[in-house]
Amino acid sequence: MAIYGIGTDIAQVSRVAAVLERTGGRFAEKVLGPDELRVFHARRARSEARGIAFLATRFSAKEAFSKAIGLGMHWPMTWRALQTLNHPSGEPYVVASGELADWLAARGITARVTVSDERDYAVSFVVAETDAAPAPAAAPVSRTSS
């Protein structure tokens, strides 16, 4: 496997909470996929803070993933097309759907994700890998002095 790209993102939890409040909860429905949304509602029912932290980590993971694959938030990368879920062990993993899944499969791209949160911030890091032959390394930039 070769590294296709890397991405990282940090989200301020209070900003995510403010957007969620301002939109009457629609922000979560816009950003989270169906499985993520179920987890968000369950966590938020137990603890408002944990629900908001979950939303912030998933928002951050989607941003980091979009950077790792080099698309940003442009088609076929959409908010709901990528979900970050957890194995029973707690290890996070990504699941793509629809045209994003097709786009990734055509390029042999898989990804590894990690998320973390503290009171004020949520951070994510994504390494996208491919089984395709790596592109040639860029030639070093030479500098001349005048």
Swiss-Prot record:
Gene: acpS
Source species: Burkholderia orbicola (strain MC0-3)
Coiled-coil region(s): none
Binding site for Mg(2+): 9, 63
Cell membrane as UniProt keyword: no
UniProt GO MF annotations: holo-[acyl-carrier-protein] synthase activity; magnesium ion binding
Function: Transfers the 4'-phosphopantetheine moiety from coenzyme A to a Ser of acyl-carrier-protein.
Annotated protein name in UniProt: Holo-[acyl-carrier-protein] synthase
EC number: 2.7.8.7
Gene3D superfamilies: 4'-phosphopantetheinyl transferase domain (3.90.470.20)
Record's catalysed reaction(s): apo-[ACP] + CoA = holo-[ACP] + adenosine 3',5'-bisphosphate + H(+)
This protein's GO CC annotations: cytoplasm
Keywords tagged on the record: Cytoplasm, Fatty acid biosynthesis, Fatty acid metabolism, Lipid biosynthesis, Lipid metabolism, Magnesium, Metal-binding, Transferase
Xref: InterPro entries: 4-PPantetheinyl_Trfase_dom (IPR008278), 4-PPantetheinyl_Trfase_dom_sf (IPR037143), ACPS (IPR002582), Ppantetheine-prot_Trfase_dom (IPR004568)
Family in the record: Belongs to the P-Pant transferase superfamily. AcpS family.
Chief location bin: cytoplasm
GO biological process: fatty acid biosynthetic process
Cofactor: Mg(2+)
Pfam family name, one: ACPS
Keyword Lipid metabolism applies: yes
